[in-house]
């Protein structure tokens, strides 16, 4: 029976926990790492250690921030307060920033609603979102959510929850394929989606 050394089996096992990584890919990556120089492996190990120690979220928008700074770079910078873009994950913010079409503020929900699995948005996160809207007083709230059932459910929920606001609510439309996650959308497509957003 095939049996790898314990250190290699453990590495393959951890790599398989990453989304989209099956056994074959994890095995290939593990053997690739075996060929790395000692200093490269130590640098990688240091990066993982820093990730576990320094990872933190901005108290204003819940994007990732550098430790020990009090806010993320987007909340620190002098950005347009007339627009607030709501996303599901911090990685969505970086996708939108690469498209270079949005200059306003962000807010991260942390998840999308999923009626099938019972996943919901935390009450505290919604309370802080409303607080953020009150503070910024934006003219437009943009729902930059995945074009999936979960994204649709979340957009409908937010439209109802934020109906009290005087801000107009829009959602990205043009260029976002149905059923596709933000992870697979290029910056050009995102730019078109932003330009062609519709009232929601």
From Swiss-Prot:
Molecular function GO labels: DNA binding; zinc ion binding
Keyword Hydrolase: no
UniProt cross-references to SUPFAM superfamilies, sorted A to Z: Recombination protein RecR
Keyword annotations of the record: DNA damage, DNA recombination, DNA repair, Metal-binding, Zinc, Zinc-finger
GO biological process, one term: DNA recombination
Positions annotated as zinc finger (C4-type): 58-75
Ranges of residues in domain Toprim: 82-177
Gene3D superfamilies: 3.40.1360.10, 6.10.250.240, RecR Domain 1
Purpose of the protein: May play a role in DNA repair. It seems to be involved in an RecBC-independent recombinational process of DNA repair. It may act with RecF and RecO.
Family: Belongs to the RecR family.
Protein's name according to its UniProt entry: Recombination protein RecR
Organism whose genome encodes this protein: Chlamydia felis (strain Fe/C-56)
Lineage of origin: Bacteria, Pseudomonadati, Chlamydiota, Chlamydiia, Chlamydiales
């Amino acid at each position: 029976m095939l049996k790898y050394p314990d250190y290699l089996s453990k590495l393959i096992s951890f790599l398989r926990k990453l989304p989209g990584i099956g056994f074959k890919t994890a095995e290939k990556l593990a053997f690739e790492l075996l060929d790395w120089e000692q200093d490269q492996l130590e640098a990688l190990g240091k990066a993982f250690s820093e990730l576990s120690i320094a990872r933190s979220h901005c108290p204003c928008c819940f994007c990732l921030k550098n430790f020990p700074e009090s806010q993320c770079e987007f909340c620190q910078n002098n950005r347009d307060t007339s627009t607030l873009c709501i996303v599901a994950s911090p990685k969505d913010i970086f996708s939108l920033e690469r498209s270079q079409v949005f200059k306003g503020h962000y807010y991260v929900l942390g998840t999308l609603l999923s009626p099938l699995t019972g996943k919901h948005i935390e009450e505290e996160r919604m309370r802080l979102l409303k607080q953020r809207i009150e503070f910024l007083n934006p003219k437009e709230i943009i729902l930059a959510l995945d074009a999936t059932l979960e994204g649709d459910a979340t957009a409908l929920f937010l439209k109802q929850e934020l109906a009290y606001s005087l801000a107009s609510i829009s959602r990205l439309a043009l260029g976002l394929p149905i059923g596709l996650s933000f992870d697979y959308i290029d910056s050009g497509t995102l730019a078109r989606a932003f330009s062609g957003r519709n009232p929601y």
